[in-house]
């Protein structure tokens, strides 16, 4: 799994409300969060399937 999968979810600095998914290391699964639209980190996916393919395996 890529190292960025270990990063915490970051909503970013903007105020949009974009449904996104991130890999939660403690829970060992992909979870939904709301992304603000700018900033953040690479542990952010448009779909839960994309998150699973990248971070779960």
Swiss-Prot record:
Under Pfam families, the record lists:
Kunitz_BPTI (PF00014)
Pinpoint the site Reactive bond for trypsin.
15-16
A GO MF term: serine-type endopeptidase inhibitor activity
| Chain ranges of the BPTI/Kunitz inhibitor domain | 5-55
Coiled-coil ranges per UniProt: none
Where found, per UniProt?
A: Secreted
- Disulphide bonds in the chain: 5-55, 14-38, 30-51
Q: Name one GO cellular component term.
A: extracellular space
Membrane-crossing segments per the record: none
- Similarity annotation: Belongs to the venom Kunitz-type family.
Primary role: Serine protease inhibitor.
Q: Under what name is this protein listed?
A: Kunitz-type serine protease inhibitor 2
Q: Which organism is it from?
A: Naja nivea
């Amino acid at each position: 799994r890529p190292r960025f999968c270990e990063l915490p979810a970051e909503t970013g600095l903007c105020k949009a409300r974009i449904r996104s998914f991130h890999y939660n290391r403690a829970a060992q699964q992909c979870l939904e969060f709301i992304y603000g639209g700018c900033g953040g980190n690479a542990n952010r996916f448009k779909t839960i399937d994309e998150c699973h393919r990248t971070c779960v395996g």
